[in-house]
A protein has these predicted regions:
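Polymerase palm active-site segment centered on the conserved acidic dipeptide of motif C
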Residues: 34-45, 66, 135-161, 169-171, ...
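A short, polar/acidic, helix/strand-boundary loop motif
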Residues: 97-120, 152-153, 370-408, 429, ...
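Acidic, metal-ligating active-site segments
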Residues: 83-91, 116, 237, 352-382
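Metal-dependent nuclease catalytic cores in nucleic-acid-processing enzymes
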Residues: 43-56, 122-126, 400-426, 457-468
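Amphipathic alpha-helical
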Residues: 304-341
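RNase H catalytic domain
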Residues: 414-483, 490
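Catalytic-core region of right-hand nucleic acid polymerases
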Residues: 1-128, 246, 253-301, 305
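Flexible, low-complexity interdomain linkers flanking nucleic-acid-processing modules
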Residues: 238-280, 487-631
Length: 633
């Protein structure tokens, strides 16, 4: 049946009979019994592909192909006797006989259709995976095998190769089957394609007429089943040579046009319907899948989505106008530089930063973990107007919360890490803070409760995007374990024992009390006044433009003795979190202190590993190179 004339039954529609009785909705009366596991994998498909690209070696080529199930729901038969639940009256002209339609297949509008159908396609995917594991060349010829060939890169491969392991991953998203392969021969690609198509036909039987086959011949004729190093998968264009991805060109151009029209409407004092705003922002959010930090620009949009006004006016909402303008700029720039998939995957940190802020100042330390950097400590005293404006019991009228200060401190930590650890492209960073709201805001790259924090999140989003850094691991550190940064943040006179009149005094204290391995020295890096002014301006809610945050002055200047770049210091820092004495006793026994230190190391390793694991997709059986989360000890 032609799509233009195909009817879709709305099973979420309540029906009122002539006698006034209302029939219960089919969806409301449905007892949900379909397997849910298939839907769990549904939302992981794109992430699985991104992670696979990120794990591949630089010198490999990734080939991609995809297959579409034609009229998928209509190929799933109802259990005998259950089809009457979908029956409906065919619309007729007045006076015509009543005609009942009794569908025998799954209906598009039924709440259980997606999980039942996805269970079938996931089963086909698992069968295909088993076929892939058979010896290359052992599967019977498939009638659609000819559609695999033709791409330039395919023709450049040798026909067969006895050396080289076959790496492949299979994904399915509703009715779209996708395979990514690192082959050493044409034979390997043909084997994987045959395995997938055979697996599909084991669940959705083949048709003698190719045009009616479950595997869409129309899509195959368009080249979708042809293995190539360039392919559009789930709305994104992937490059198997450079391991990059970017929003499909047509979708990106349409988004840019819409956002531009919104900004023009603002200049004309016009509004746009809320429905359009909601729909387009959802597409922008999806586009930001391929743009590091992009979500951090959407806080003003999130606030409006919660209010749901009938009309959205940009000229009345400066933060919203700025957010849309920033989003359009980042999307436009992505046209000339696709995102490397490695920029989108978290992992064990190359560098670690720990920060603390008080009403007096901010202090932090920066150390190398998997990569080397100068072990660095920094501090910055807040100006008097900031200290005086901090909200507290003694100052309930203050407009800056402690959490705002902590997030501002974390932004300063990040800017200092850009200076100390550069370059940060494709590096993995862990940031520790003892403030729970700060950790939550950075994890979500969004804030609902503070306009100051909202602007600070925007700053981080812009800087993450510029640096092309991997997803940030943000973790909470207990306050009583954060003395290494408590000290510099309170070193301006509020704590007499930690009052350092100069950066040289701070350096001496750290080298004496936090002695580095191998007689190395700490480096004290002083934030420049220009970079400090930018951070403080956000606390003052002074407007800054996109360029103000994209083109930064030098962030810091080293003071006094400079240490040597080193790595693997994070576990060493944990030795300064175990107390050396308890009230009521002279000291810990050495064995007890060592035991507590070992427990703390294990717990903190687990904390980072769990945080990284949460940013990874659900596990799935595949033959693809994978980097373990925990580094080899």
């Amino acid at each position: 049946m032609s799509k233009a004339f195909r009817s879709i039954l709305d099973l979420s529609f309540s029906l009122r009979l002539k006698n006034g009785r209302i029939l219960e909705l089919v969806n409301d009366s449905t007892v949900k019994m379909a397997p849910r596991g298939a839907l769990d994998q549904l939302g992981q498909a794109l992430s699985q592909i991104i992670h696979a690209f990120a794990e591949a070696d630089e010198d490999t080529k990734i080939f991609m192909a995809k297959w579409d199930i034609k009229d998928g729901f209509w190929r799933m038969d109802c259990e005998k006797g259950e089809e009457y639940n979908f029956s409906y009256v065919l619309p007729q002209e007045e006076g015509m006989p009543i005609t009942l339609v009794v569908p025998t297949s799954l209906q598009m509008g039924w709440v259980e259709s997606p999980p039942y159908f996805c269970a079938a396609t996931e089963t086909a995917r698992d069968i295909a995976s088993d076929y892939c594991d058979t010896p290359v060349g052992s599967l019977p010829h498939h009638k659609f095998a000819k559609h695999v060939k033709g791409a330039k890169e395919f023709n450049e491969l040798p026909t067969a190769s006895k050396k080289g392991k076959l790496f492949y991953a299979l994904e399915v998203y509703v009715d779209d089957f996708m395979s990514i392969v690192i082959p050493t021969s044409k034979e390997q690609l043909e084997h994987v394609a045959t395995a997938i198509m055979t697996g599909i036909h084991d669940v959705f039987p083949a048709d003698i007429v190719d045009g009616n086959d479950p595997i869409s011949e129309k899509k195959l004729l368009k080249g979708e089943g042809q293995y190539s190093v360039f392919k559009t998968l789930l709305g994104f264009d992937f490059d198997g040579k450079r391991k990059t991805m970017w929003l499909e060109e047509e979708k990106r151009a349409k988004l840019l046009t819409i956002l531009h029209s919104w900004l023009r409407a603002s200049s004309l004092n016009r509004g746009i319907p809320f429905g359009e705003f909601e729909s387009v922002i959802a597409k922008v959010r999806h586009a930001f899948t391929a743009l590091p930090g992009g979500r951090g620009l959407l806080s003003p949009c999130n606030r409006l989505l919660k209010k749901r006004p009938q009309v959205v006016y940009f000229h009345r909402n400066a933060p919203l106008h700025e957010a849309i303008s920033n989003c359009r700029t980042i999307l436009r720039e992505s046209t000339s530089r696709p995102t490397r998939c490695r920029e989108l995957v978290a992992g064990w940190p190359d560098f670690i930063g720990v920060v603390d802020a008080s009403s007096h100042g901010v202090g932090g330390v920066i150390i190398g973990e998997l990569s080397e950097c100068l072990p660095t400590v920094f501090r910055l005293q807040w100006p008097p107007d900031i200290t005086a404006n901090v909200k507290s019991e003694a100052n309930p009228m203050g407009t800056i919360t402690n959490s705002d200060l902590e997030l501002a401190g974390l932004v300063l930590l990040w800017l200092m890490m850009e200076h100390v650890c550069a370059p940060l492209t494709e590096k993995r960073i862990a940031l520790f803070s003892d403030n729970s709201p700060t950790v939550s805001w950075v994890e979500r790259m969004a804030c609902r409760s503070s306009l100051v924090a909202e602007q600070l999140i925007r700053v981080l989003a812009l800087r993450f995007n510029i640096q092309k850094v991997c997803p940030i691991t943000t973790l909470h550190i207990a306050g009583d374990q954060n003395s290494m940064t408590d000290i510099p943040s309170r070193s301006f006179g509020s704590e007499h024992k930690w009052h350092f009149k100069s950066e040289h005094d701070l350096l001496t204290f750290f080298n004496t009390n936090f002695t580095l391995p191998s007689q190395n020295s700490w480096t004290v890096c002083q934030p420049t006044s220009a970079i400090a002014t930018r951070v403080i301006s956000v606390l003052r809610m002074t407007p800054l433009t996109l360029d103000d945050w994209r083109r930064l002055p030098a962030a810091g200047k080293n003071i006094g003795t400079t240490g040597k770049s080193t790595r693997l210091l994070w576990e060493w820092t944990l030795t300064f979190r175990v107390p050396t004495s308890k009230s009521g006793s002279d000291s810990y026994p050495v064995s007890q202190q060592e035991s507590e230190q070992a427990i703390m190391v294990t717990e903190n390793k687990s904390k980072i590993a769990q945080s990284v694991a949460r940013l990874r997709p659900l596990g799935r059986r595949s033959h693809w190179p994978v980097t373990p989360i925990l580094p080899k000890s």
